[in-house]
Amino acid sequence: MSLDVQSYMAERARAVDAALARHLPSESDPPETLHKAMRYSVFAGGKRLRPVFVIAGAEAVGGRMDTVMETACAVEMIHTYSLIHDDLPAMDNDDFRRGVPTNHKVFGEAIAILAGDALLTLAFRLLADNFAAGSDAHALRNILIEIADAAGSAGMVGGQVADIESEGKRVGAETVDYIHTHKTAALIRASIRAGAMLAGATPSQLVALGLAGGNLGLAFQIMDDILDVTATSEELGKTAGKDQAQQKATYPAVHGLEVSRIHAKALVSEAHAALQSFGPRAEPLRALGSFIVERKA
């Protein structure tokens, strides 16, 4: 029987939401405005795809969701901080995210910047909290390095810089690949590997999961590019057509829609092949890959 990926994602997203509610500061704790801004963006919706990837990565090597929940929450906080900052006028200048006004439209630019900063730093506190859960210290060191590299100048932030510097320019496939593998795929790859590390994955398993995660992350961003062209703002929960309006470097702009779709599906097929040795334990990762290329928003 094939996995019901929607139910799988919904069940784990609910668990992640409950954990996030526990770990985030209360809105009644000072500074109240900052904590309201942090919680506003974290709980503004979203698929919780990255924390679900953390959990699926652990499950692929026999781990359990409860042992990786702090790491799953940390990854979601890093992702949310990046969205808050991406939406600022100095960057993508977007008014809506996940169907609601962006953080800076509600709280102002200064508080939005600080809310992002606070989420990023809290994320690393949560990663360290895995010590209290009795996890292996060597694995935690490796996870800290993995996620810091994926989130920083060697990963997500570096990809964002390349994205900004490419606006309005004619760029080739190599530049688009660099942007997407760093800005998006790096954190998805790290999410899967981090979950597996906490669950005691072997070096060879981490190599295979890294290959699968990189391909799934790139496929996800290619589909984001496609949906920016084909979906409505209501379906996306954010302004559609922004990539073309801002002359961003995207897969459809360089390769066209059809070639982009074919490439995304090929990447998912390669990810499935990399997961073959994991057997049924990796079925959630396979199903998430299929979801990535079939989603409509």
Q: Which residues are covered by each model-predicted region?
A:
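N-terminal amphipathic/basic leader segments beginning at the initiator methionine
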Residues: 1-25
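Mg2+-dependent prenyl diphosphate-binding active-site environment of isoprenoid biosynthetic enzymes
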Residues: 15, 24, 28-274, 280-293
